[in-house]
């Protein structure tokens, strides 16, 4: 890609510096010089070691675990850039934390996804670039442009190369009713049929698989979702496909590998042969499982950043 010298600058916090470096590599530019650290009392500080006056600045920072620290790093860096007279600031948030708190599920609940949107805007962000928001309506929580990239083209390319034309006995599976639209779009691109696992969630981070909708008997199934958190939903869905549905095998893919708590242990002990994830969240404990495979998002984000900088449509990236 074209290098734009001082006119475009990419900075990052501590959440995923390797992704930021890879994005810069594909863009043909270097990562901006900065320091993001903490004082002795835990307060976060940001120091910028190069001028950003008038520059089109992109800050790469996933708000993954530790969520609050990474979010504060992002907000403080945006504020520092704004006060340093950056021309435009784009918050590049490959994984947007707090996205699951997008509505009032019960009385007196906060809508934290909206609060985070307000904080990013107040800090000085001029636009947001993210990927596979857990709830697409979060785009409407902002009064600034939000580009929500889709991760499924990366998975489509991966599985097309992996299985080639041998897709007759394969089926895409939505792990719950709420993910049907996302899984259907993925299945259509792979020219596969769709099945659904109907589940009833008893409490947060636990679920009970109830029924398999669709004939998966003897099929090789690909479960498709936007994230893997504790792995409970994923592993229960996979077990249901084998036990209740009679599936031949199960693999899975998801955009965001949160992998909190017992997730990796559950995956290792499950019937799932492979879990393909995108590296929107830095793969910290992935080495503990040979079933987890990471696919790079840097090329897609680099192209999106180039297009935003050049004021060119990015709609092509959503197809």
State the predicted function of each range.
Residues 1-319:
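PRPP-associated nucleotide enzymes
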């Amino acid at each position: 890609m074209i290098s734009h010298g001082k006119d475009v600058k990419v900075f990052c916090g501590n959440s995923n510096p390797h992704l930021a470096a890879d994005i810069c590599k594909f863009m043909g530019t270097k990562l901006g010089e900065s320091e993001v650290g903490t004082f002795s009392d835990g307060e976060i500080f940001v120091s910028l070691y190069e001028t950003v006056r008038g520059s089109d600045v992109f800050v790469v920072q996933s708000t993954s675990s530790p969520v609050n620290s990474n979010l504060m790093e992002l907000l403080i860096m945006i504020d520092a850039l704004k006060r340093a007279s950056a021309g435009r600031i784009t918050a590049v948030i490959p994984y947007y934390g707090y996205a699951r708190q997008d509505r009032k599920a019960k009385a007196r609940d906060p809508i934290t996804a909206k609060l985070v949107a307000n904080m990013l805007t107040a800090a000085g962000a001029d636009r947001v670039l993210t990927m596979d928001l857990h709830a697409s309506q979060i785009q409407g929580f902002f009064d600034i442009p939000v580009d929500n990239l889709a991760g499924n083209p990366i998975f489509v390319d991966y599985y097309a190369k992996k299985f080639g034309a041998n897709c007759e006995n394969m089926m895409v599976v939505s792990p719950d009713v709420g993910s049907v639209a996302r899984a259907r779009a993925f299945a259509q691109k792979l020219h596969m049929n769709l099945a659904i696992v109907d589940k009833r969630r008893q409490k947060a981070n636990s679920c009970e698989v109830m029924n398999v909708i669709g004939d998966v008997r003897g099929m090789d199934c690909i479960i498709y979702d936007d994230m893997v958190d504790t792995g409970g939903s994923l592993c229960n869905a996979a077990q249901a496909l084998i036990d209740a549905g009679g599936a031949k095998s199960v693999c899975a893919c998801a955009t965001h590998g949160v992998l909190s708590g017992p997730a990796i242990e559950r995956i290792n002990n499950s019937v799932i042969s492979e879990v393909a994830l995108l590296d929107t969240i830095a793969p910290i404990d992935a080495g503990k499982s040979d079933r987890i495979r990471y696919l790079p998002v840097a090329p897609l984000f680099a192209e999106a950043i180039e297009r935003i900088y050049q004021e060119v449509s990015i709609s092509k990236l959503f197809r």
